[in-house]
């Protein structure tokens, strides 16, 4: 589906995320449509964006939500931006199903 902010790859998925640091809680809040029409997975973390802490918290949040090891989740692009591209390694079909369930709950 083109309206989803993730794309399956040979060894996992790539997810476009809009992160709100210092968001008051750690949560994934579903899919948001940006002004340019692109879909992003909206997430927030409690920590401030200093020394990569918000990126680490985001990776842990996604790993916990998908029930996978944190080492499977990395920031592929946008390390210093609110808009990030997250790489998740694993079975692509399983990850896409889990992301769809996660987005519906958000």
Where are these regions (language model features)?
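Contiguous, often N-terminal, cationic amphipathic patches that form binding interfaces
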Residues: 1-51, 55-59, 64, 70, ...
